Regions:
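Short histidine-centered catalytic/ligand-binding loop motif
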Residues: 98-123, 175-186
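Helical (often loop-to-helix) elements that flank the catalytic cores of nucleotide-handling enzymes
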Residues: 165-185, 190, 194
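Active-site microenvironments that recognize anionic phosphate/pyrophosphate groups
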Residues: 2-106, 200-235
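Histidine-centered divalent-metal-coordination microenvironment in nucleic-acid enzymes
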Residues: 97, 143, 147-174, 235
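A short linear hydrophobic-aromatic micro-motif
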Residues: 85-87, 139-143
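A short, terminal or domain-edge coil/loop segment
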Residues: 139-141, 184-209
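Short secondary-structure junctions
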Residues: 81-82, 131-139
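Long, well-ordered alpha-helical scaffolding segments within enzyme catalytic domains
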Residues: 112-134, 185-198
Length: 235
């Protein structure tokens, strides 16, 4: 199956046409998008932002999976295992601002299966540990995003907060804060943070811990099902 998937991906890659892109200094400088298309933009490029012109029915997550060659180095995953992906957020160049996404589409986090949600929580915790130990980020707001938009997948963010104390989330203008960071001033720091965090997660062997947790959770779930079936059989 793996070989078939690899062959299929190669065929898909060969059929794909190169995408056009537009570079601008400010996001509001992007011209109107062509009919039937949408912009998938990242910070970086020859100016501050680069937008690829992609089919309107593709989500950002699907774009990054299907067109990995267009994902900038600073937005490559720092952790990826069994459907959960951690990377620097591609829209705002805030060092230490990480997004936790999924390779399957869910509209809301309560629709996740229990095992995936518990793994999500564990990976969030371990990533935050790395941010504290390796990046000196003591506090971060944990945010979730759910939309009815069919091309938006549920995800979580860790938004770093400067200083030794964190402002109350209700008093915190997240968009204003994130928009204050300029790509040309932050790219080197983002790359450094990514390197440090990726090395930390590799050093603690998070993939192994993640897989062990998954096996335990599945084992517990199967044990519960078996007990229920036995109890019903004895009635």
């Amino acid at each position: 199956v793996k070989e078939m998937n690899t062959d299929f991906r190669k065929q898909l890659s060969q059929k794909k046409k190169p995408l056009e892109y537009i570079d601008v200094d400010k996001r509001e400088d992007f011209p109107p998008v062509p009919n039937g298309m949408r912009y998938i933009h990242f910070y970086g490029g020859t100016k501050n932002y680069r937008a690829y012109i992609a089919p309107e029915d593709i989500s950002r997550a699907d774009f990054m999976e299907q067109y990995p060659e267009y994902v900038p180095e600073h937005n490559k995953p720092v952790y990826e295992n069994n459907g959960i992906i951690v990377r620097a957020d591609p829209k705002y160049p805030c060092p230490g601002f990480y997004i936790f996404g999924l390779n399957k589409t869910y509209r809301a986090f309560d629709l996740l299966d229990d095992t995936t949600f518990l793994r999500y929580s564990f990976i969030l915790k371990k990533t935050k540990e790395g941010m504290r130990k390796e990046l000196g980020i003591n506090y971060a707001h944990l945010l979730s995003n759910e939309k009815s938009d069919p091309f938006v997948n549920v995800h979580f963010w860790l938004v770093p907060v400067e200083g030794t104390t964190s402002p109350d989330l209700l008093d915190f203008n997240v968009k204003e804060y994130l928009s204050s960071f300029k790509p040309e001033e932050q790219l080197d720091k983002i790359l450094l943070y990514n390197k440090k965090l990726k090395e930390y997660l590799k050093r603690i062997d998070l993939v192994k811990q993640d897989n062990e947790l998954t096996a335990k959770l599945i084992g517990m779930k199967n044990k519960c099902y078996s007990k229920v079936e036995n109890d019903e059989a004895e009635r």
